[in-house]
């Protein structure tokens, strides 16, 4: 299975400096993947100037996004929002054209927090990046762990859970309780560093009490029928698409996006009484190297243009 190392693999290409035009350094698209990697990310079509060298299964870095050289804004986003970036940054640049070189990471929020604690350093394969974020955005519970980091925070979106299954739902998964069945292979975010993992555990207890949580998170982990991911927003869809897992509890927007892509998946709704809401919060870092850019970006998230992007991808409006 594609691990964090596989999905992020080696170095992302730094974009050409802003002085180089698209005429001298044309936008290129990566070579389409072969059948064995036909569902591999990145799932967007990045319009970046430079020599395209994405090799699926080898050199493929979907969660490091944009300019690593002299960025004017650095954002650490919880990974489940990766799908908004193309539209969100395009609209942000329209509203604030002074910011063109932007670097974004969309990794699990717990990993991003560890990176911040190490001065912004991240090692992927042979690549080391050391960029301090201007903005850190994650679920409210994660943000509440480190209030001392932020000059200010702002809620900008909400989300809820769904269950991702293959087209046709071959195991007939109808509810969270079905994930406790021994024959249903589950892809589950690791609660150790993925905030969604703990929220899904809460949902298990709502749906089936401690017995369901124990079945999925203890009994089936030992049996090998629950797989704990390192980066669920990439691994869980891939495991379902490649028939390595039968079902994956995910954020609704992740299932929604896979359907937008035309991938052969379906979404199983979770009733409100068993579901949970996530409140996404963005914080301007006190130590932001680009403080004004951080302020402008967090303000933009709640602007009509910013909110329209989140609505397009199935997110709910923020807590008022």
Residues of each region from the PLM?
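Exported/periplasmic ABC-transporter solute-binding proteins
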Residues: 22-103, 107-114, 126-132, 140-141, ...
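Positively charged n-region of N-terminal signal peptides that target proteins for export
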Residues: 1-4
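Generic internal hydrophobic packing segments that stabilize the cores of diverse globular domains
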Residues: 12, 140-143
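Conserved hydrophobic/amphipathic secondary-structure segments
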Residues: 136
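N-terminal post-signal-peptidase region of extra-cytosolic proteins
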Residues: 117-125, 145-149
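Bacterial N-terminal signal peptides
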Residues: 7-18
């Amino acid at each position: 299975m594609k691990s964090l190392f596989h999905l992020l693999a080696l170095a992302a290409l730094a974009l050409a400096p802003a002085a180089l035009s698209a005429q001298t350094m044309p936008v290129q698209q990566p070579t389409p993947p072969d059948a064995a990697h036909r569902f591999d990310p990145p799932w967007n079509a990045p319009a970046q100037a430079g020599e395209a060298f994405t090799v699926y299964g080898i050199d493929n870095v979907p969660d490091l996004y944009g300019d690593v050289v002299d960025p004017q804004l650095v954002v650490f986003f919880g990974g489940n929002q990766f799908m908004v970036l193309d539209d969100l940054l395009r609209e942000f640049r329209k509203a604030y054209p002074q910011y063109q070189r932007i670097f974004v990471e969309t990794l699990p929020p717990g990993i991003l927090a560890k990176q911040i604690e190490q001065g912004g350093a991240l090692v992927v394969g042979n690549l080391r990046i050391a960029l301090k974020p201007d903005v850190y955005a994650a679920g409210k519970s994660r943000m509440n762990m480190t209030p001392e980091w932020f000059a200010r925070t702002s809620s900008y979106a909400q989300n809820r859970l769904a269950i991702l299954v293959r087209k046709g739902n071959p195991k007939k998964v109808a509810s969270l309780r079905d994930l406790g069945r021994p024959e249903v292979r589950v892809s589950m975010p690791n609660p150790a560093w993925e905030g969604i993992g703990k929220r899904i555990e809460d949902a298990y207890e709502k749906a089936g009490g401690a017995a369901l949580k124990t079945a999925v998170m203890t009994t089936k982990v030992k049996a090998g029928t629950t797989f704990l991911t390192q980066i669920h927003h990439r691994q869980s869809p891939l495991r379902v698409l490649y028939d390595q897992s039968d079902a994956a509890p995910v954020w609704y927007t992740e299932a929604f996006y896979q359907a937008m892509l035309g991938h052969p998946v379906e979404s199983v709704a979770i009733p409100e009484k068993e579901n949970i809401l996530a409140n996404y919060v963005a914080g301007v870092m006190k130590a932001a190297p680009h403080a004004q850019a951080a302020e402008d970006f967090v303000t933009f998230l709640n602007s009509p243009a910013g909110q329209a992007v989140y609505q397009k991808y199935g997110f709910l409006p923020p807590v008022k």
